[in-house]
């Protein structure tokens, strides 16, 4: 939302924008101590809470299909395990030269959805 906007989500967009800016700022400030700072951004993630929310909507299967149709990679929600795998990568030595980054673990939702809409 901080990168794309969607309407009626000003507070959420502001919080996401702050996360993005602070990630970059803290990466610069903590660089001299050898501390890397990165953030993870997710879109729709299938969790028990999300499942409960969607199951309390009228036509839950239809709503889930509508949401998942907007996720370009495999038309499905991200799993908690996929997010955890991304975090494990950022915490590992495999990302030893990565700092100040916002990593989107969202099946291409933020950066590909709008581009593919016209394809």
Where are these regions (language model features)?
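Catalytic loop of short-chain dehydrogenase/reductase
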Residues: 1-18, 23-32, 44-45
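Short C-terminal tail/terminal secondary-structure segment
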Residues: 4, 88, 99-119
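Short, small/polar-rich loop/turn modules that mediate ligand/substrate recognition or access, typified
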Residues: 31, 36, 98-100
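A glycine/serine/threonine-rich, flexible loop-to-helix segment
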Residues: 32, 45-71, 114-119
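Proline-glycine-enriched beta-turn/loop adjacent to the NAD(P) cofactor-binding site
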Residues: 38, 42-48, 101, 108
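C-terminal helical subdomain
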Residues: 39, 61-94, 98, 105-107
């Amino acid at each position: 939302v901080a990168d794309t906007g969607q309407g009626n989500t000003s507070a959420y967009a502001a919080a996401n924008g702050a996360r993005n800016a602070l990630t970059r700022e803290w990466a610069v400030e903590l660089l001299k101590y050898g501390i890397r700072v990165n953030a993870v951004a997710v879109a729709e993630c299938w969790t028990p809470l999300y499942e409960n929310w969607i199951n309390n909507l009228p036509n839950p299967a239809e709503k889930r299909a509508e949401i998942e149709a907007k996720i370009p990679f495999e038309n499905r929600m991200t799993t908690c395990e996929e997010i955890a795998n991304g975090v494990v990568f950022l915490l590992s030595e495999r990302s030893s030269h990565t700092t100040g980054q916002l990593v989107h673990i969202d099946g291409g939702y933020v950066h590909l959805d709008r581009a593919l809409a016209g394809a």
